[in-house]
From Swiss-Prot:
It is found in: Cytoplasm. Required for rescue of stalled ribosomes mediated by trans-translation. Binds to transfer-messenger RNA (tmRNA), required for stable association of tmRNA with ribosomes. tmRNA and SmpB together mimic tRNA shape, replacing the anticodon stem-loop with SmpB. tmRNA is encoded by the ssrA gene; the 2 termini fold to resemble tRNA(Ala) and it encodes a 'tag peptide', a short internal open reading frame. During trans-translation Ala-aminoacylated tmRNA acts like a tRNA, entering the A-site of stalled ribosomes, displacing the stalled mRNA. GO terms for molecular function: RNA binding. The keyword Cell division does not apply. InterPro entries: SmpB (IPR023620), SsrA-bd_prot (IPR000037), SsrA-bd_prot_CS (IPR020081). It holds the Pfam family SmpB. Keywords: Cytoplasm, RNA-binding. It comes from Shewanella oneidensis (strain ATCC 700550 / JCM 31522 / CIP 106686 / LMG 19005 / NCIMB 14063 / MR-1). This is SsrA-binding protein. The lineage of its organism: Bacteria, Pseudomonadati, Pseudomonadota, Gammaproteobacteria, Alteromonadales. The keyword Signal does not apply. Signal peptide: none annotated. It comes from the Bacteria.
Length: 163
C-alpha cells in the first residue's frame, strides 16, 4: 500500500526579478533571510509577490528591501493593517552587512534582489546581487551575444540533420 504525503511540495522559486539581470551586471550573489509577518507568508504561498523595481538599502547597520510588493489576501488577518509595500528587513550576518556597506559606500555598487524562493519548505529566502548598472552599449552587447548563441545553435542543429 502506498502512503500518501499530506503536505504539498511548494515550488522552490516564488518570484524572479527578470529586469535585474538586464539592468545590472552582478559581481557577487548572496542569500538573505526575510523578516515577514503572518499575512505576508500566506500571500507569498499564494504567489502574490512582485520583485520588479525592488532594491536594498542599508540604514543604521541593517539591510532593508524596498519596493517589494506583497498583495494581501482577502481572507488574511483582519486585526492587522496590511501594508503591501512595507519595508522588509533582510536577515544577514554582521560580517555580510559590513562587507555590503563597504562596497556600496566606497565603490558605488547597488544591491538588487534577484529572486525569492523557499529554503527547506518553510523559510523564505532572497537572493541578492551586488553589482553595477549597465550602460546602453553593454545592453546592446548582451543582446548581440544572446542572438549569436541562438543563431549558432540553429546552424549546429541544421548541420547535424545534414550529416
Amino acid at each position: 500500500m502506498v502512503k500518501k504525503n499530506s503536505k504539498k511540495a511548494a515550488p522552490a522559486t516564488i518570484a524572479r526579478n527578470k529586469r535585474a539581470t538586464f539592468e545590472y551586471r552582478f559581481e557577487e550573489k548572496m542569500e538573505a533571510g526575510l523578516s515577514l509577518m503572518g499575512w505576508e507568508v500566506k500571500s507569498i504561498r499564494m504567489g502574490k509577490v512582485n520583485l520588479s523595481d525592488c532594491y536594498v538599502f542599508l540604514k543604521n547597520g541593517e539591510a532593508f528591501m524596498h519596493g517589494c510588493t506583497i498583495i494581501p489576501l482577502n481572507t488574511a488577518s483582519t486585526h492587522v493593517v496590511c501594508d503591501p509595500i512595507r519595508l522588509k528587513k533582510l536577515l544577514l550576518s554582521r560580517k555580510e552587512l559590513d562587507k555590503l556597506a563597504g562596497l556600496v559606500e566606497r565603490q558605488g555598487y547597488s544591491i538588487i534582489p534577484i529572486s525569492m524562493y523557499w529554503r527547506k519548505g518553510a523559510w523564505v529566502k532572497v537572493e541578492i546581487g551586488l553589482g553595477k548598472g549597465k550602460k546602453d552599449h553593454d545592453k546592446r552587447e548582451d543582446t548581440k551575444a544572446r542572438e549569436w548563441e541562438v543563431e549558432k545553435a540553429r546552424v549546429m542543429k541544421k548541420e547535424k540533420t545534414r550529416g
